[in-house]
């Protein structure tokens, strides 16, 4: 009971104990502390795994065997709590880093275990060691590696964002298939190691500039979603972007319009929402950041429904201001019966989810090239409101996830460079147009630009882009 109580106390005070130990070691070892700690752990684990052989050749009595086994597995428990002493800005990142470190330990000590296991089998066959020693060695080796592996994999599965569902499922499916399981484990290690390094850097950056309040704009932000989605607390349409903006001082509200309706109907909902926010908070105006069709909804509300007096700026993200030939192609070529069937299923499903009157066909129709051409003529910009836009494009069909990987080549055929849905030539609007060019082979899709998939893309930091975007609004007095 005392041992269990000690373990509970150790876990409760783990952060403080780890930080104190790390500070003392860094004072002595300097910048090599983390590597030294890692090597020491690997050596101790290897020595512990080899302990049955070592004690046999040393002629150790039974009490020493019991003492060594107890000490080794107590050490393993402590190692599961403190695999490294490096500090991390959040609890999630610390657990993620610990799990990643333990996966590495499993690999490194596993290589040593192959040699130990091979020698044990040879020694037992040649009668160099008794069968009991060989069995003891096998049990200790198996249990130690099992503890290290499962501790590491459970930690990264529970805390990693970048693994996503795909890698988690593949990890389980290939878990018992040699050597695919080892290849998958290497991939998981690489993903979580990069995630931990990137997220730690971001957290430290936000901490260092917290007092600067980069995103504390004069007017709050209103984030307006695109078509076929709803604002949800369970899964934020804007991914990790709102949390990043709020960490830098932003005040954020959401459009809360239906998932699919005509531009006119969605705009009416937005206009009511904006007026209610202004009256309730006394903020005077809002800065709208709208994605996809949300940009058209916002333009209509500002120009036609009197929201111009409540809106300081409108920033559209990958909005099809000049329409989507892809949408027009679908409506013109798809069988009417099929379109009606999809419409019925969609409207029924989203009505159950809370939309009062979803209208799939009206939403898609208002995104067509011909409808948007007329919309642009009938919806001039309101004076006194600052308009600007952002667009991006993918590199190829493999850049995006389903269904963007299927729609990209079709949009490419009709509209050229696109994000999987919206052509780059359709996105410009207002006094300034920012193009987000992909730096690698992947590109930036319609979903990527709002962090819908919560995926870190090498070469472009979406969250930092939005921080700087909002900071520019602040610097301009909005």
Model regions and ranges:
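Flexible, membrane-associating and regulatory peripheral segments of lipid-active enzymes
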Residues: 2-234
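Soluble, non-transmembrane catalytic domains of enzymes that act on hydrophobic metabolites at membranes
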Residues: 2, 6-9, 308-312, 316-317, ...
């Amino acid at each position: 009971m005392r041992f269990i109580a000690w373990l509970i106390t150790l876990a409760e005070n783990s952060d403080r104990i780890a930080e104190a130990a790390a500070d003392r070691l860094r004072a002595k070892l300097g910048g090599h502390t983390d590597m030294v700690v890692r090597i020491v752990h690997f050596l101790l684990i290897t020595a512990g795994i080899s302990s049955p052989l070592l004690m046999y050749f040393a002629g150790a009595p039974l009490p020493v065997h019991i003492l060594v086994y107890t000490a080794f597995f107590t050490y393993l428990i402590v190692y599961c709590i403190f695999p490294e002493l490096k500090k991390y800005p959040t609890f999630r990142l610390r657990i993620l880093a610990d799990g990643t470190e333990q996966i590495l330990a499993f690999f490194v000590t596993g290589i040593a275990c192959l040699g130990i296991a091979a020698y044990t089998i040879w020694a037992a066959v040649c009668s160099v060691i008794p069968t009991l020693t060989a069995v003891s060695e096998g049990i200790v080796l198996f249990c130690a590696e099992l503890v290290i592996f499962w501790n590491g994999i459970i930690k990264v599965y529970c805390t990693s964002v970048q693994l996503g569902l795909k890698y988690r499922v593949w990890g389980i499916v290939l878990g018992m298939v040699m050597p695919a399981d080892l290849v998958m484990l290497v991939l998981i290690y690489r993903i979580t190691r990069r995630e931990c390094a990137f997220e730690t850097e971001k957290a430290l950056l936000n901490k260092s500039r917290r007092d600067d309040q980069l995103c504390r704009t004069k007017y709050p932000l209103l984030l307006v979603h695109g078509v076929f989605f709803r604002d949800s607390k369970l899964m934020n349409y804007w991914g990790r972007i709102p949390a990043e903006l709020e960490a830098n001082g932003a005040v954020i509200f959401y459009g809360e319009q239906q998932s699919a309706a005509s531009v006119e109907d969605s705009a009416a909902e937005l206009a009511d929402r904006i007026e209610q926010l202004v009256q309730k908070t006394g903020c005077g105006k809002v800065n709208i950041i709208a994605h996809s069709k949300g940009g058209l909804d916002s333009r209509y509300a500002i120009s036609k429904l009197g929201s111009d007096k409540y809106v300081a700026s409108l920033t559209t993200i990958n909005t099809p201001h000049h329409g989507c030939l892809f949408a027009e192609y679908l409506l013109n070529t798809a069988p009417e019966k099929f379109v009606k069937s999809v419409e019925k299923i969609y409207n029924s499903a989203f009505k159950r989810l809370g939309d009062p009157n979803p209208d799939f066909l009206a939403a898609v129709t208002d995104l067509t090239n011909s409808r948007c051409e007329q919309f642009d003529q009938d919806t001039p910009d309101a004076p006194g409101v600052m308009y600007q836009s952002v667009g991006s494009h993918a590199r190829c069909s493999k850049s995006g996830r389903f269904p963007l990987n299927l729609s990209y080549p079709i949009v490419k055929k009709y509209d050229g460079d696109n994000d999987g849905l919206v052509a780059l030539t359709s996105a410009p609007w207002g006094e300034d147009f920012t193009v987000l060019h992909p730096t690698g082979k992947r590109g930036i899709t319609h979903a990527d630009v709002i962090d819908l998939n919560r995926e870190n893309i090498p070469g472009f930091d979406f969250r930092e882009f939005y921080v700087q975007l909002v900071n520019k609004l602040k610097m301009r007095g909005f």
